[in-house]
């Protein structure tokens, strides 16, 4: 299978293909040097072809693998996959500018490449919280193919709702590929927590004095037993209760990993684990996104959290690829 991955990040699609035992020639467009570092550390066979805005406008004539990509004929790519930046589309951004924003407007670069490459299949991923208007524009541009919303919580311990547009080239036109909702594997946060993990950053280990209200204090002191839940369960907060100050139970799902949020625990959420509140480790975040434990260990924790927050959820991509590979 010949694959072109746009906004490739840490090559989640390559990981999904590996787990499905699908051989591939994998071409990746990515500009984040740390994400590329992670990708190269895990897969030395990926051909990195640079900034999406320069594709088919410039390439390294001294790199034979680049030339191999550019010499391919239109229609030779089997799969085009990408998740264009969501920052201007996400409800998390108060002044979101939609598809006119500097980053989310890169969707149109994806569209340009889709029309130039004409792959047999395409997958586009983006946030489910985008406005109705943005969703309608993307759907219209993608040949009226309707997206399916899949929550990663069905396949992992993370609550992460995303839209997926999946199309197949049939007689010169793109048609909808029917994707079924995955079956719930009933994986919860408690199932992926590292054993013996100790957080040495004291500011993440809280006691009752950090809390304004009594709910969390009561929970810690009485040690109440709970059932498991299929969504994030918020126990309480400290300071002003912003996203990075909220504490959740590991008996539910994690909140959605975030690449850019600030605050003490905003990228992963804070969770009550063995009597203290802490953020998740990068290994635990790898598990939430379906990667091997040490997938991002080549970079700092800061860059590891960021790259995982920007990534696809591997089991979801595997689920979609199963539907595609069966008809290739």
Task: Give the role of each language-model region.
Residues 45-52:
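Conserved SAM-binding strand-loop segment of SAM-dependent methyltransferases
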Residues 39-40:
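Conserved SAM-binding loop
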Residues 6-11:
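Class I SAM-dependent methyltransferase "Motif I" SAM/SAH-binding loop
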């Amino acid at each position: 299978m010949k694959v072109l991955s746009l906004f490739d990040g840490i090559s989640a699609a390559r990981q999904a293909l590996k787990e499905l035992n699908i051989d591939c020639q994998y071409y990746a467009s990515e500009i984040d040097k740390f994400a590329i570092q992670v990708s190269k550390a895990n897969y030395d066979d990926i051909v990195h072809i640079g900034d999406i805005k320069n594709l088919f406008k410039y390439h390294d004539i001294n790199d034979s693998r680049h030339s191999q990509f550019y010499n391919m004929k239109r229609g030779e790519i089997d799969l085009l996959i990408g998740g264009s930046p969501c920052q201007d589309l996400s409800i998390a951004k108060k002044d979101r500018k939609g598809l006119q924003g500097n980053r989310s407007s890169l969707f149109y670069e994806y569209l340009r490449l889709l029309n130039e490459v004409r792959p047999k299949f395409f997958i586009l991923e983006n946030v489910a919280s985008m406005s109705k208007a943005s969703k309608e524009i993307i759907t219209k541009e993608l040949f009226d193919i309707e997206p399916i919303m899949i929550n990663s919580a069905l396949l992992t311990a993370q609550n992460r709702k995303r839209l997926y547009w999946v199309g197949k080239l049939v007689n010169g036109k793109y048609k909808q590929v029917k994707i079924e909702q995955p079956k719930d594997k009933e994986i919860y946060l408690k199932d992926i927590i590292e054993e013996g993990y100790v957080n040495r950053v004291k500011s993440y280990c809280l006691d009752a004095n950090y809390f304004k209200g009594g709910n969390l204090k009561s929970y810690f002191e009485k040690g109440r037993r709970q059932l498991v839940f299929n969504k994030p369960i918020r126990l309480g907060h400290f300071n002003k209760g912003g996203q990075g100050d909220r504490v959740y139970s590991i008996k539910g799902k994690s909140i959605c990993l975030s690449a850019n949020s600030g605050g003490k625990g905003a990228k992963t959420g804070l969770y009550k684990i063995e009597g203290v509140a802490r953020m998740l480790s990068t290994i635990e975040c790898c598990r939430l996104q379906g990667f091997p434990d040490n997938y991002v260990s080549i970079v700092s924790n800061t860059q590891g959290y960021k790259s995982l927050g920007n990534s696809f959820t591997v089991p979801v991509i595997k689920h979609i690829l199963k539907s595609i590979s069966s008809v290739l």
